[in-house]
Amino acid sequence: MSKYEQFRREHSVFLYRSYEITESADKVDVSYKFSIPGLADFNPGWSFPKPENVSVSGDLTFERLVFSLGMAEAVSYWKAVCSPEMIVECGELDGEQISWWKKLWFAGLGEFFYVNGINADKESFVKIVPKGKFAGTSAAELRKSEGCLVPIGGGKDSALTIETLVNAGMNCRCYAINKRCSISATVEAAGLDESALITASRR
């Protein structure tokens, strides 16, 4: 029996237990709870800057975004044992969304499967079972979209992207995860002020 099969037999269920949203005057904190029963619990989190006089309390659109970020986070912990079943105890998923997430996960795990010699099937590698409900009730306020948001990692691709868009006259804001000197340098080199950079923190 391979380790893949052994781990799946020993840890048949992975749980996406919950997410929690808290906000202060200038930021929103998000925390998640994932669990491999009998083995480990995981509690990653994010912090996002927030404009003054803006609240996300009860905002269903924001809650959906937070839930989806959790679905993207979960795979990093699921792959520790590759449980054949993932029970999602929060948020909501319909059949089409489940298929979409399975496709995204499977494609994103290609190198992981290859390096570890895992012969996984895209249909049966995981069964996603939704059991939750959203708490939010109000739709987000409609806002007019202006300019573009450019993800910045500090490498050549993001530097070229932001330079091209700025030179084309686009109104650009930059988005980064866990600020580093190379990220600030990329924004500055594009001729943008530091205030054009939105930085989220992952913990």
Which ranges hold each PLM region?
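Hydrophobic/small residue at the entry helix of a nucleotide-binding pocket
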Residues: 157
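Contiguous, non-catalytic segments that form substrate-binding/exosite surfaces or channel walls
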Residues: 161
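RNA-binding accessory domains that recognize and position tRNA/RNA substrates
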Residues: 1-147, 164-194, 198-201
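Active-site cores of enzymes that catalyze phosphoryl transfer or operate on phosphate-rich substrates
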Residues: 153
